[in-house]
């Protein structure tokens, strides 16, 4: 049976419902339309979302590109500014270097001119001497001929007589000429030496430090004083025994004074006491522990200070023990001048002067840096600091030139090389130029008082005034009891007393004043 026959039978049968069939057909059509519409709507929504996503992506890409462009422009501007700064710095350095070169060229030109003038003067003097010698020879020949004609003396006797006569006549002139040449040469050398020293001094500047023998430690409260002292004073006794300092506790609010002439001990005590106060546990066991830590910190600080000084001067090849001992000079002072700073300054001055006179600046710099290293050695070694320092650096492989320069910088031994003289000169410049060193106020007042007292102890002195920071003393004597000759003797006597009994850094000018005043009143 075919499908058409089957459909016909169904349609003819009573079971077939046309309304249901039509409904199914309409429902299927509507379902198809709904599915088609939904699919179309879905596709349209997908297209719209895709377009929106594409637009968002395009905008984000544009924003990212703009950010990248701005960042690149900022980096370019920063690089350009950095290059401009570097260019400006290099231009300034080039200008400074050019000025230095021009100044050096001017100095060389001046030296060339001075040498030319000296050579011309020498040539003129040589020509004058030759002319004088020729004139003397001609005169001698003429006199000899005349004498041979009128005398029975032989030629040798006449020659000897003429030689003695001419020698007597020319001796004074030659001596005066020699003195003039030597004075001019000495003056030129002094002028050049003064120029070199002034140029070296102007390139460095130093400031005095405070030469203290005590250190103040602040306390958080007054109760801490009792904890530092401890029961029956056991804590403070243990602290003083471990550090070797004196701890002074008085009525000063919230302060403790640490006193010691050894700056390293004083610094160790300060660090240990501050650590104990911060920790809060103060008893003999912790005191020993914190003092040991403070010693280690001081050793590290000294090593770092030595390395900084060596790096600053660009010196290579120093033994670590030398660097360590050199760093300890950081804690020592001489007339308010830090010894490590003084050593660095001496090294720089010696290097500059060596460069000016054509010597090796590195050798001079090395010797200048190490010249006072003996001051950092403890008191177990005997001898002056120059001798101790020379032996110490010899032990660690320094060259004989440097060793002799250190040993001879106070002229305790004979300088063997010119570098020893350079170190002496640089050390003197660093120590005595204005502002480099200064006495403590108490020592300054005491020295002025002793100076005036020495003058007042001489018979006939009425008043004495120390002026110019102790570099000059003016003595007023009684004109009734002191004559002019006695005033001169008083000046000499006071000079001898000052040299024998007083220590002073430079020179002291002595002025004795003897004057009489006569007053009349007209009525």
UniProtKB/Swiss-Prot annotation:
<keyword id="KW-0378">Hydrolase</keyword>
<keyword id="KW-0255">Endonuclease</keyword>
<dbReference type="InterPro" id="IPR006675">
    <property type="entry name" value="HDIG_dom"/>
</dbReference>
<dbReference type="Pfam" id="PF12072">
    <property type="entry name" value="RNase_Y_N"/>
</dbReference>
<dbReference type="InterPro" id="IPR004087">
    <property type="entry name" value="KH_dom"/>
</dbReference>
<dbReference type="GO" id="GO:0006402">
    <property type="term" value="P:mRNA catabolic process"/>
</dbReference>
<feature type="transmembrane region" description="Helical">
    <location>
        <begin position="18"/>
        <end position="38"/>
    </location>
</feature>
<protein>
    <recommendedName>
        <fullName>Ribonuclease Y</fullName>
        <ecNumber>3.1.-.-</ecNumber>
    </recommendedName>
</protein>
<comment type="similarity">
    <text>Belongs to the RNase Y family.</text>
</comment>
<dbReference type="Pfam" id="PF00013">
    <property type="entry name" value="KH_1"/>
</dbReference>
<dbReference type="Pfam" id="PF01966">
    <property type="entry name" value="HD"/>
</dbReference>
<keyword id="KW-1003">Cell membrane</keyword>
<dbReference type="GO" id="GO:0004521">
    <property type="term" value="F:RNA endonuclease activity"/>
</dbReference>
<dbReference type="InterPro" id="IPR036612">
    <property type="entry name" value="KH_dom_type_1_sf"/>
</dbReference>
<keyword id="KW-1133">Transmembrane helix</keyword>
<feature type="domain" description="KH">
    <location>
        <begin position="213"/>
        <end position="276"/>
    </location>
</feature>
<dbReference type="InterPro" id="IPR022711">
    <property type="entry name" value="RNase_Y_N"/>
</dbReference>
<dbReference type="InterPro" id="IPR006674">
    <property type="entry name" value="HD_domain"/>
</dbReference>
<dbReference type="GO" id="GO:0003723">
    <property type="term" value="F:RNA binding"/>
</dbReference>
<feature type="domain" description="HD">
    <location>
        <begin position="339"/>
        <end position="432"/>
    </location>
</feature>
<dbReference type="InterPro" id="IPR003607">
    <property type="entry name" value="HD/PDEase_dom"/>
</dbReference>
<dbReference type="InterPro" id="IPR004088">
    <property type="entry name" value="KH_dom_type_1"/>
</dbReference>
<dbReference type="GO" id="GO:0005886">
    <property type="term" value="C:plasma membrane"/>
</dbReference>
<keyword id="KW-0472">Membrane</keyword>
<keyword id="KW-0694">RNA-binding</keyword>
<keyword id="KW-0540">Nuclease</keyword>
<dbReference type="InterPro" id="IPR017705">
    <property type="entry name" value="Ribonuclease_Y"/>
</dbReference>
<comment type="function">
    <text>Endoribonuclease that initiates mRNA decay.</text>
</comment>
<keyword id="KW-0812">Transmembrane</keyword>
